[in-house]
A protein has these predicted regions:
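Short, charged amphipathic recognition helices of the HTH superfamily
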Residues: 120-140
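Short Lys/Arg-enriched helix C-cap and helix-to-coil transition segments
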Residues: 163-173
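Major-groove recognition helix of helix-turn-helix-like DNA-binding domains
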Residues: 144-163
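Positively charged, polyanion-binding regions of nucleic-acid-associated proteins
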Residues: 102-124
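Long, low-complexity interaction regions most often at the N-terminus
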Residues: 1-86, 90
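Short amphipathic alpha-helical segments that mediate assembly, nucleic-acid/protein binding
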Residues: 12-16, 38, 98, 110, ...
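Intrinsically disordered, low-complexity serine/threonine- and proline-rich regulatory segments
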Residues: 87-103
Length: 173
């Protein structure tokens, strides 16, 4: 099924750059019905507010393609009760939904960072850890500044302290 519209989500510049780097230069995410992100998007679809304006500066925004969800689903609770969601009218993601999607993408970046660091980690010297963090930021076109490096190194040190015995890369089948 083809999707017909997109919804804009404010995620911040760093997440925008990460999505563009992982998505072949595009800031539009194409979803599958079986993903967690589609579940979050579908829960938070809403009608356009009256004060909605078209976004000119897209440096902090990504777009999510809305799948065709024009279908009837009958549930066993009450007879003849159907849910009908049409993305023609529900093409806006609420503020709470945008925050949930931003948190989900932040967790995905954090998981990708930890897997990257586990694969690059050798003996744990501070200079090598900072170099690995810098190469992660440059590989995913994220801005390199002291605040982000300090935040990621703090996250890595806490993760390493908590999971000192588990330095394997997870493999999913």
């Amino acid at each position: 099924m083809k999707s017909s519209s997109t919804a804009d989500i404010k995620v911040g510049a760093a997440i925008h750059n990460w999505v563009v780097a992982n998505n072949g230069g595009s800031d539009v995410i194409r979803l599958d019905r079986r993903t967690n992100l589609w579940g979050i998007v579908k829960q938070n679809l809403d009608t356009l507010p009256n004060d909605y304006h078209i976004i000119q500066d897209r440096s902090e925004y990504i777009a999510v393609e809305l799948l065709d969800v024009r279908q009837h689903k009958t549930y066993n609770r009450t007879a003849d009760r159907e849910i009908y969601i049409n993305e023609l009218y529900r093409c806006y993601i609420s503020e709470a939904g945008q925050a949930a999607i931003r948190r989900y993408l932040e967790n995905q970046i954090r998981a990708a960072f930890r897997v990257y660091m586990i694969s690059r980690y050798s003996d744990g010297q501070d200079e090598q850890i900072r170099h690995a963090i810098g190469s992660f930021l440059s590989d995913f076109d994220l801005p390199i500044n002291n605040q982000i490096i300090a935040r990621l190194s703090k996250d890595w040190y806490r993760y390493r302290q908590k999971n000192i015995e588990k330095y394997e890369i997870p493999i999913f089948f």
